[in-house]
């Protein structure tokens, strides 16, 4: 049995989020939530919400026992960038790209 949760367009770069995702890949649910709770990174809070959503999906849709679940796979994909401009000297402007990503978590036995 596999249960999936996806968060699309998370307002953080894929590179920063992958650092957190690599820490919890393959861990049990309880251990993964502990790692995410005590991580100081912004991405940890976002990934934790996606993992909790996957747990809720497992309980509600599949009726699964959450004590047996593990983080089977977690992957982070780059999403579209938000283009912004910032003012520079002498009436010029520079483009800023604010990165976004898609977070996909799969839980299984």
Swiss-Prot record:
GO terms for cellular component: cytosolic large ribosomal subunit. GO terms for molecular function: rRNA binding; structural constituent of ribosome. One of its GO terms (biological process) is translation. CDD domains: Ribosomal_L22. PROSITE patterns: RIBOSOMAL_L22 (PS00464). Pfam families: Ribosomal_L22. InterPro entries: Ribosomal_uL22 (IPR001063), Ribosomal_uL22_bac/chlpt-type (IPR005727), Ribosomal_uL22_bac/org-type (IPR047867), Ribosomal_uL22_CS (IPR018260), Ribosomal_uL22_sf (IPR036394). Gene3D superfamilies: Ribosomal protein L22/L17 (3.90.470.10). The keyword Metal-binding does not apply. Keywords: Ribonucleoprotein, Ribosomal protein, RNA-binding, rRNA-binding. Part of the 50S ribosomal subunit. This protein binds specifically to 23S rRNA; its binding is stimulated by other ribosomal proteins, e.g. L4, L17, and L20. It is important during the early stages of 50S assembly. It makes multiple contacts with different domains of the 23S rRNA in the assembled 50S subunit and ribosome. The globular domain of the protein is located near the polypeptide exit tunnel on the outside of the subunit, while an extended beta-hairpin is found that lines the wall of the exit tunnel in the center of the 70S ribosome. Belongs to the universal ribosomal protein uL22 family. This is Large ribosomal subunit protein uL22.
């Amino acid at each position: 049995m596999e249960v999936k949760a996806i968060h699309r367009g998370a307002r953080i770069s894929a590179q920063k989020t992958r650092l957190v995702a690599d820490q919890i890949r393959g861990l049990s649910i309880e251990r993964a939530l502990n790692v995410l709770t005590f991580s100081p990174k912004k991405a940890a809070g976002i990934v934790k919400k996606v993992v909790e959503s996957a747990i809720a999906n497992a309980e509600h849709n599949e009726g699964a026992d959450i004590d047996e679940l593990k983080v089977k796979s977690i992957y982070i994909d780059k999403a579209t960038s938000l283009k912004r401009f910032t003012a520079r000297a002498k009436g010029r402007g520079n483009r800023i790209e604010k990165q976004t990503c898609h977070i996909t978590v799969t839980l299984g036995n």
